[in-house]
């Protein structure tokens, strides 16, 4: 089976407030179809997403669609260089508690964010991922910005026993939460996801990233994705968790700007 490459442009996370940019023209139609299918199934999303706008625009074009939080507007399609690019922004008006009935937090984490993530990473079990998110946010709030907190759990992905661990990194200006997933008997084949709990303001520069190319034999086999690892603002992911880290989403305002610029890394997924 021929490998397909998905590109995620980390430069579009935070400034401007785009979720990510996909630059593989062949992948975009399938991806947008998944997003639309999810929206069609989620009636509660109508409170903060105009599903008709999505459906109408998705049928017309999939090129460079941008979803702006709070407004729900889609901007005019544009071509990024000679590549087809799709921009999505996580809508932050929905409360995390609305989705999981998690009363410990008022952080905004929407169903659409879950959908967008899972559209690209289809083999993550719903229950495991949601449990990760719920535990991560709740424990993060309870820890009151402690430097690091580890919470290992057991779960199953595609019938395989796995361990997943939530790690927190906090500084005065930026905070992240990383969730590590790995097979119990293959700890080196580990997949981590990292997302900031506090996002940059619109006039700030991009969240800093660093280039990382996984060593041979230390990556999951399958499709390839280009991504950015967040290492700026004093944040350094735990050495055990730095492999295969993906910057996912921004949830709140950051308290200070960052001057670093992103460079891409790459990750292989099952």
Predicted regions and their residues:
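Charged, low-complexity intrinsically disordered segments and flexible loops
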Residues: 149-154, 200-206
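Solvent-exposed strand-loop boundary residues in beta-sheet-rich modules
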Residues: 185-187
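Structural motif
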Residues: 172-180, 232-239
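Structural core positions within WD40/WD-like beta-propeller blades
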Residues: 160-166
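Long amphipathic alpha-helical scaffold segments
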Residues: 97-98, 102-155
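Eukaryotic scaffold repeat domains enriched in small/polar residues
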Residues: 151-159, 170, 230
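Acidic, small-residue rich beta-repeat scaffolds with periodic aromatic anchors
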Residues: 1-119, 201-270
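Solvent-exposed serine/threonine-rich low-complexity stretches and specific carbohydrate-binding patches
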Residues: 190-200
